[in-house]
Amino acid sequence: AKTNIFVFAIYFLLSMGCHAQNIATSELNGTKWKLVSPVSDYCERGMSFTMTTRTTTAKFKKNKKEFQFPLKYYLSSSIPQTFDSSQIGKNRKGSYIIQYVDNSVFWFKIVDISSTKITLLSKLGDTTVYQKVK
């Protein structure tokens, strides 16, 4: 009986680690998010989505200057080897936001999403939490 509990415990931990949220492009379309973790003292960060573009924003508190970084994206259920631009703008379901950065695939895993919050894990290992603005 002890072995069963041990196996179950390991299975439970593994399933937690692999758990990701599936979402459709149409559900992200038109949404706007504000970064709530990690928070910066000098800069407000956010992101917004259209069907084709994920735009990250940085607004500096001191001089109120805002910078926008729009990048094409698509959703995928796994991490692709190459960026498939034919998938941009299609209403796909997936737990990964796939982008093309510096000639290679960059991804964010959607760890959790609710009507008010989204948690992303990046290819670099950073976890960010955003609160929904609209």
Question: Where would I find each of the regions flagged by the language model?
Answer:
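Bacterial N-terminal signal peptides
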Residues: 7-15
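Short, low-complexity, Pro/Ser/Thr/Gly-rich segments in the mature regions of secreted, periplasmic
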Residues: 125-133
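N-terminal helix-cap/turn-to-beta initiation motif at the start of protein domains
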Residues: 19-32
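Bacterial N-terminal signal peptides that target proteins for export
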Residues: 1-6
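Contiguous, well-ordered beta-strand patches that form the walls/edges
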Residues: 38-43, 57-115
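Short, solvent-exposed mixed-charge patches
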Residues: 21, 133-134
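Start-of-domain marker
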Residues: 30-47
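Ser/Thr- and Asn-enriched, surface-exposed coil loops between beta-strands
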Residues: 52, 114-118
